[in-house]
Amino acid sequence: MSTSTKRCYYETLEVERDADESKLKSSFRKLAMKFHPDRNPGDDTSEVKFKEINEAYEVLKDKDKRAAYDRFGHAAFEQGGPGGGAGFGAGFASSFSDIFEDLFGMAGQRGRGGRERGADLRYNMEITLEEAFGGKTAQIEIPVSVTCEACSGIGAKAGTKPKTCSTCGGAGRVRQSQGFFTLERTCPGCQGRGQMIEDACPSCSGQGRVTRERTLSVNIPQGVEDGTRIRLAGEGEAGVRGGPPGDLYIFLSLAQHQFFQRDGADLHCRVPISMVTAALGGEFEVPTIEKGKAKVKVPAGTQSNRRFRIASKGMPVLRSRQTGDMYVQVVVETPQNLTKKQQELLAEFEKLSSGNTQPESEGFFTKVKDFFGSRAN
């Protein structure tokens, strides 16, 4: 491209002429990510734009080159020009490599020899409230990828070894130079592994791992809650070609309980009581989560939905010595299917009742009477 058709380097990087180093680098990163060939496969326009961006940044990030460009323009870098002869050599390649390994992860997740960390696995487990209270050790069976014993995870047939890729020299990546521009890509020969397996292991088809059923012991501590996650390090899928294994994550869910509702470390339950017990007072027993019993004393005149607290009868707090409380909510039942004698007794009780025995009802009807009386006036 001749100097007469080249765009201004500042326009190419979309910055002002007085832009400082941080603004240059920020704009360069943004544009480079946008037009990088790996993100725009087959787009020749993006590749040309990407080269222009790198050329502009290579000049403007260097104080001496920038000063020469500001004075002479593109002519400063033509052969025989005021600043010619330097070209874009190793300095550009180094800058490109440093920046784009950071931007696009060119260092990769693979180690030398194509070793890759195994995938993490998830296992969903439902437990009861009683199990969450006391803790338990559970046995689970899961299908996982394990290291192939036939090839010891290498992927090559027994008696053979992988060979270093001749294309990349075992690096897993290759560099392609186009004049001043150097682009680093995944090696097409070994697909980034750095090694070539000419005779694959028949047991694992060269993957270095096979699928097996594995039985694991899972320790569930006291006080776990719905959604608690337990990590078993190294119990995920085996790594590829000798890479480290992934982890296994156990996600716990609590089954609905027939009697208790849980709120953090506290437990709640509803217990029906008779109208007589509510009026005269009494005592009853309720089951506790540890399979015991607790007594609840009901004072005379107890109203429906009143709650009673039983200290330290709730759930243990995970990884703590603290324990929640248990709350018992009483529900006063209205009697049904009364005999004639029972109906007569209740009717007699109603005649004998006064504002002292039913203060809320008396107060309510007094308010209603006052309301309609005020409207009549």
Swiss-Prot record:
Cofactor note: Binds 2 Zn(2+) ions per monomer.
Binding site for Zn(2+) 2: C165, C168, C187, C190
MF GO annotations: ATP binding; heat shock protein binding; unfolded protein binding; zinc ion binding
Keyword Ribonucleoprotein part of the UniProt annotation: no
GO biological process: chaperone cofactor-dependent protein refolding; DNA replication; protein refolding; response to heat
Domain J: 8-73
InterPro entries on file: DnaJ, DnaJ_C, DnaJ_domain, DnaJ_domain_CS, HSP40/DnaJ_pept-bd, HSP_DnaJ_Cys-rich_dom, HSP_DnaJ_Cys-rich_dom_sf, J_dom_sf
Gene3D superfamilies: DnaJ domain, Heat shock protein DnaJ, cysteine-rich domain, Urease metallochaperone UreE, N-terminal domain
UniProt entry keywords in alphabetical sequence: Chaperone, Cytoplasm, DNA replication, Metal-binding, Repeat, Stress response, Zinc, Zinc-finger
Main location: cytoplasm
Binding positions for Zn(2+) 1 per the UniProt entry: C148, C151, C201, C204
Zinc finger (CR-type): 135-213
Subcellular location: Cytoplasm
Requisite cofactors: Zn(2+)
GO cellular component, one term: cytoplasm
The CXXCXGXG motif repeat ranges on this chain: 148-155, 165-172, 187-194, 201-208
Domain notes: The J domain is necessary and sufficient to stimulate DnaK ATPase activity. Zinc center 1 plays an important role in the autonomous, DnaK-independent chaperone activity of DnaJ. Zinc center 2 is essential for interaction with DnaK and for DnaJ activity.
The protein's assembly and partners: Homodimer.
Family affiliation: Belongs to the DnaJ family.
Function: Participates actively in the response to hyperosmotic and heat shock by preventing the aggregation of stress-denatured proteins and by disaggregating proteins, also in an autonomous, DnaK-independent fashion. Unfolded proteins bind initially to DnaJ; upon interaction with the DnaJ-bound protein, DnaK hydrolyzes its bound ATP, resulting in the formation of a stable complex. GrpE releases ADP from DnaK; ATP binding to DnaK triggers the release of the substrate protein, thus completing the reaction cycle.
Cited PANTHER family: CHAPERONE PROTEIN DNAJ, DNAJ HOMOLOG 1, MITOCHONDRIAL-RELATED
Protein name per UniProt: Chaperone protein DnaJ
Species assigned in the record: Bradyrhizobium diazoefficiens (strain JCM 10833 / BCRC 13528 / IAM 13628 / NBRC 14792 / USDA 110)
Gene that encodes the chain: dnaJ
